[in-house]
Amino acid sequence: MTQIRTMTEQDVPAVSLLLGQSWRYTYSPILGAETTARLSDEKHAPERLAAELRDDSKMSFVAKRADGSLAGYAMAAMDDKGEVMLERLHIDKGEYGTGLAADLLLAVLAAHAGIPSIALEVIEGNDRAIAFYRKHGFEVVERREAAHGVEGRASLIMRRLLPMA
């Protein structure tokens, strides 16, 4: 059984490790191993993750197993217009198919109750993620070139409209 809670500073090393593993597994076949490693090391450095925790516009969640190990992580950011972007949702490969990713997504949505929609960016070719988000009500609204600054790799912007309470 996993418990989802708000991320703390103590979670930073494990989250950094999980993100590195998840990125390498997911994106190496799409972006190449070298590019994936470079981007992941830049984006998921512990000091960067710790700084994000201090940013009031961002909310981060972790899913912890009963033994205390990290099973998943999600982070969403709200811009100055009140629009929310799901920046990250990653789970340990061993958790695929368990419903954990859906639970993390629900935690993010619950934390942002009352917003009209939530968006995300996914690299074209990440078919597993695209299928997951479609299953959970997201639709492609835009295609962008140079996903994550990588020329020749497009990304899809997906959005889910949310019921207003």
Please provide the spans of the model-predicted regions.
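Extreme N-terminal starter segment of soluble prokaryotic enzymes
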Residues: 2-3
